[in-house]
Amino acid sequence: MTTSSMYSFCAMVALLVLVTVGGIGGCSGDRGGGPEEESATLTVLAASSLTNAFSELETAFEEQNPGLDVSTSFGSSSDLLVQIQQGAPADVFASADEAKMQTALEEGLVEESKIFAMNRPIVVVPKDNPAGIQVFRDLGEADAQLVLAEAKVPITEYAEDVLANADSEYGDGFGQRVLDKVVSREANVRASANRVALGEADATFLYASDVTDDVRDRVQTVEIPQNLNVLATYPIATIEGSQNAELARAWVDLVLGDEGQRVLERYAFQRVN
């Protein structure tokens, strides 16, 4: 065999080896079952009072959407609004009042909102009730130390509305006497609930939905008279610029639908349909 023929033969063998190896690699890839399923993360910003209900819905939504991870961040509605204003990546906003949502709407941060639940403000005291607060009116007379959420948190705004109503019932100055007993401001309703459950405060304003299993045995509820109370309304909206707009709208549909409403009702929210 000439030198030229030898080179040609070697080149042919090398080519056959490459084709064979490539073919094996290709077959091996085919046996892998095709491309892997892509995963996605849906970020929901929700008021603290929604923690239990939305955590349950999170599990249900993930089961309905394999490969999806729902990341739910709970906090005061005012803090969540600030996060959205500062450009935090998120897909859904669920607020404990309409004022925060209206601000988000006016600033073009969210799409059209819908009311999905209502809640009832209440007062809670420790189980042993050391200040002897038996009825709502006692808040103005008792030697008590109160905790309350920070000023812009919806529950505090609702509480202030209730106290303003109480002035007309119990006399001017009642509401201010109650506010004068506040010794600490908490980040959100859950923090306030824990302070009372631990016996670190004599009373606080919460929502009915905040008397959850982890505090129920350690607190008592003092109802606010119906003629003085207000109704907390909860709006929800998808966030403008969401990278998961279709999934975000599906989450909103879940919350507004029968399954979501049943879950919310189980956690002491009032359903809207």
Question: What are these model-predicted stretches?
Answer:
Residues 91-95:
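Periplasmic-binding protein-like
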